[in-house]
């Protein structure tokens, strides 16, 4: 056997021979996401594992998604809805609901920022998707990755890959997508508004709130209990003050581990041969439209409240009504600080932001109640 024949056989058995243009295209997309995560620092905790999962799965013959493959094993946490629910528990342990409790009007802003969910649902039904598929696509507009995975698993499991990738990618790209919309819809005067300090919230209120939310929402929409139940359990860990170890684990070690596995699993759904088709492009377009309309809905209600209150509410906090916590609130703070460096909107924006988490989960529960039997 000659050297050249050995070399030829080696090349034929290598990934180079099996590399397709779809793999190359997705690898290039992963490089763009690497750049955004590492250089631009666009939510690297999410974008870096997603982009690396996308990169790995498009390396031919690696077997990562084969039966028994390491990422395939991880992906069971996505398919079973375990990861989304555990992420919600970690988010609950990290979240202070005081801004929402102190300023209940934030609930309205959180609700208005779900506009994109329903707009995308209507659009999706008009371009060939079933109502159940359209509902799963629409949830992307809530900028809530765990909820998007949860509803896709239940209503449109065959669309889980593009929905999950779109939802998490747009969450990570919030600092790029939202500011132009926010600036286009508000005046310099509105963006510079300084809001008054929020009232102090008692410990009793903080403890009663998660219990009351789960009680009401789960009785109204039972299908939302796994998500909101674990979200509020994590928050109760935090606010009770008696299980500090559980709270620390949920908001640090546990959510970090789950984020790594969830990010890799979501990114690994973007395999070139199955990901690059017309339905995926439609979903990505619908997801972007949903996200933009959600931002628009929140800002427009913020402008209305600005007028009603005589200029006491900064419309920028409305854009934080999407449920990407705390990314959307940070964007409101950043845009507001550019107009008025002494402005501190972060805590005010956290009210609509955490309301958006509840709002998107409730929207998902409503869709599941209506469309679960129509798959």
State each model region's role.
Residues 1-69:
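N-terminal alpha-helical transmembrane segments of multi-pass membrane transport
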Residues 33, 55-56, 77-101, 234-237, ...:
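Hydrophobic transmembrane alpha-helices of secondary-active transporters
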Residues 39-47, 64-74, 94-109, 243-251, ...:
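Interfacial helix-loop-helix linkers and transmembrane-helix boundary segments
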Residues 76, 80, 88-94, 109-119, ...:
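Alpha-helical membrane segments and immediately flanking helix-loop junctions
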Residues 100-121, 271-298, 349-353:
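Entry/N-cap segments of selected transmembrane alpha helices
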Residues 159-176, 286-294, 317-320:
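Alpha-helical transmembrane segments
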Residues 169-242:
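Membrane-embedded hairpin module used as a gating/binding unit in multi-pass transport
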Residues 214-298:
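Transmembrane helical segments that form the transport core of multi-pass membrane transport proteins
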């Amino acid at each position: 056997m000659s050297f050249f024949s050995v070399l030829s056989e080696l090349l034929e058995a290598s990934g180079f021979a099996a590399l397709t243009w779809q793999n190359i295209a997705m690898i290039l997309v992963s490089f763009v996401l690497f750049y955004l995560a590492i250089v631009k620092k666009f939510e690297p905790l999410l974008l870096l594992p997603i982009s690396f999962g996308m990169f790995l799965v498009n390396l031919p013959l690696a077997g990562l998604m084969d039966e028994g493959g390491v990422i395939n094993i991880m992906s069971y946490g996505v398919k079973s809805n375990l990861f989304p629910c555990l992420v919600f528990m970690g988010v609950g342990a990290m979240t202070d609901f005081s801004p929402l409790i102190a300023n209940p009007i934030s609930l309205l802003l959180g609700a208005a920022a779900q506009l994109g969910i329903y707009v995308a649902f209507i659009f999706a039904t008009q371009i060939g998707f079933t109502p159940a598929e359209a509902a799963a696509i629409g949830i992307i507009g809530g900028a809530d990755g765990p909820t998007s995975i949860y509803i896709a698993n239940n209503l449109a499991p065959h669309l889980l890959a593009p929905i999950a990738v779109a939802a998490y990618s747009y969450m990570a790209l919030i600092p790029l997508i939202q500011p132009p919309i926010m600036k286009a819809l508000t005046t310099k005067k509105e963006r510079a508004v300084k809001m008054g300090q929020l009232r102090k919230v008692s410990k009793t209120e903080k403890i009663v709130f998660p219990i009351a939310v789960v009680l009401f929402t789960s009785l109204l929409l039972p299908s939302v209990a796994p998500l909101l139940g674990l979200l509020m359990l994590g928050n109760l860990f935090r606010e009770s003050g008696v299980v500090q170890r559980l709270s620390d684990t949920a908001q640090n070690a546990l959510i970090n581990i789950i984020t790594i596995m969830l990010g890799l699993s979501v990114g690994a759904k973007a395999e070139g041969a199955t990901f690059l088709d017309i339905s995926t492009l439609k979903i990505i377009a619908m997801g972007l439209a949903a996200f933009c309309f959600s931002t628009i809905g929140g800002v427009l209600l913020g402008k209305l409240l600005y007028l009603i209150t005589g200029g006491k509410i900064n419309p920028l906090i409305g854009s934080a009504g999407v449920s990407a916590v705390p990314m959307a609130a940070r964007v409101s703070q950043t845009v507001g600080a550019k107009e008025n460096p002494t402005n501190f909107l972060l805590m005010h924006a956290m009210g609509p932001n955490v309301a958006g988490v509840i709002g998107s989960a409730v929207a998902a529960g409503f869709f599941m109640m209506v469309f679960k039997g129509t798959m």
